[in-house]
A protein has these predicted regions:
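Active-site-proximal substrate-binding groove within the catalytic cores of carbohydrate-active enzymes
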Residues: 1-136, 151-153
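C-terminal beta-strand-rich structural cap/linker in extracellular carbohydrate-active enzymes
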Residues: 139-165
Length: 165
């Protein structure tokens, strides 16, 4: 992940200084760590202010906390097209966390909608206990086809995730 100009592109190809591009930098980190990707960062520093260091620590700690499920298989919920949410479901039927649902909003407006999520590959068959990134907990009964209907509220140009047990 280039943090500074890499193979040309000028100012448009860099997010340095990082402290002046905090939302962009955080979204890039959320995309990588939320997908279970350990990227190679190209640049002289990972952070240039206490705020950027805080963002790095937030996402590194997220990855460490959920590593077992993030390193598992991935189910794509829908083809990303830039016109609606993008969703990944990480699954690990043998772990404590059976799934981690990562949802991204590429739009400038919030996305609030009911989505259907197939939990078949999590190994769950009756009930799913979900906790979102704000600590809200909910239990949902699985339908006969292993799906749940979930109301999501994804802020603009941001993400929402749910740990599934």
């Amino acid at each position: 992940m280039p943090l500074v100009e890499y193979h040309g592109g000028g100012k448009a190809a860099t997010i340095e200084p990082l402290k002046e591009h905090l939302p962009h930098y955080e979204q890039r980190l959320a995309n990588l760590f939320g997908a279970g990707v350990q990227a190679c960062f190209r640049g002289p520093q990972l952070y240039d202010s206490p705020q950027t260091k805080e963002i790095i620590l937030k996402w590194v700690n997220f990855y460490k906390q959920h590593r077992e499920v993030l390193d598992g298989d991935i189910v794509h919920l829908r083809r990303p097209d830039g016109r609606d949410y993008d969703g990944l479901l990480h699954v690990n039927p043998f772990g404590e966390e059976k799934g981690l649902l990562m949802l991204y909003n590429p739009l400038d407006v919030p996305i609030q909608k009911d989505i259907s999520v197939n939990l078949y590959y999590t190994g769950l068959d009756k009930e799913a206990r979900l906790e979102d990134n704000k600590g809200n907990k909910i239990s949902l009964e699985l339908n006969r086809d292993y799906t749940i209907e979930l109301l999501v509220n994804i802020p603009p140009r941001s993400q929402q995730w749910f740990v599934i047990k």
